Amino acid sequence: MYSAVQVARYIINFCYSIGRPVSNLELQKIMYFLQVLFWRAYKKELIEEEFCAWRYGPVIPVIYNMYSGYGGNLIKNRYADNVIDDNYRDFLNANIRRLESKGPWTLVDMTHAQGTPWYQVYDNGYGDGYIISKELIKKDTTLIN
């Protein structure tokens, strides 16, 4: 399991390397769906921190705060560190490409679909800021098709 910072840096670096830098909003959604997909593939969590239900979908607050200075603009940071195990890189890279190609607002719409973990927790705003349990995330079926 990796810290949210480690995974965020990996995504930012990878997206930059393919000429498709991401915004904070897009980063958050890619991280969320990677957590879902990683659990499905490996039966273990990719990211140790919890996601919270915010207006525009699942968010890890510490990551949001790290990149909030960019607003809706693309993140320009680059990182030298890379602690992601080689055994997972092909899986992560393929899924980051897949998710990034959808664009941030499609990813937001996917997290907002009726019945998703975000939808259940956010509850029309009554659950704004509440933690989306890892048990709910493990059951997310958004990306099955």
Locations of the language-model features?
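Domain-edge interaction signal
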Residues: 1-145
